A protein has these predicted regions:
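Glycine-anchored helix-breaking recognition loops at helix->coil/strand junctions
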Residues: 1-14, 42-51
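Non-catalytic DNA-recognition/assembly elements of restriction-modification systems
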Residues: 19-139
Length: 139
């Protein structure tokens, strides 16, 4: 008992949940599907050299950046940390593939040294030390 936090309705009313357009909701839903697949105990490893939980941690990093952009869009654009502009075309290019292939290709895309999302994630501490770096360190 007492494992899960309990909230009262009045506490949830002040919780800052963003209302986002349907087209953006789909992106978050896709990433959630990827994570649920990767964390299934009975799913095969997508890559022979990398455990699914390792892939999931990178997908969580991308998803975190997307969430930050929901709440700090202007700031992220000002300091060149916005990522949705890069994630959107990749997701669109993967949409007709099986989920395993989507995850594999997203991971391989993200692992490239020139990947803008990956580079921006690594720049959080220097470009946004007082906002995003503080949040990111607590995740």
């Amino acid at each position: 008992r007492g494992i899960f936090p309990q909230f009262k309705i009045n506490e949830l009313e002040i919780f800052p949940i963003k209302n986002i357009a349907q087209k953006n909701q789909i992106k978050f839903s896709i990433f959630s599907d990827f994570l649920m697949y990767l964390y299934q105990q009975n799913s095969n490893n997508i890559l022979s050299h990398t455990d699914n939980t390792r892939i999931a941690s990178h997908i969580e990093d991308i998803l975190n950046m997307m969430v930050y952009e929901l709440y700090f869009e202007e700031h992220m654009k000002e300091v060149d940390l916005d990522v949705l502009q890069f994630v959107t075309p990749v997701l669109e290019s993967l949409q007709n593939l099986p989920i395993e292939q989507q995850i594999k290709e997203l991971y391989e895309w993200y692992q490239k040294p020139e990947n803008a999302v990956r580079q921006r994630l690594m720049l959080i501490d220097t470009r946004s030390p007082d906002i995003l770096a503080v949040i990111h360190k607590s995740v």
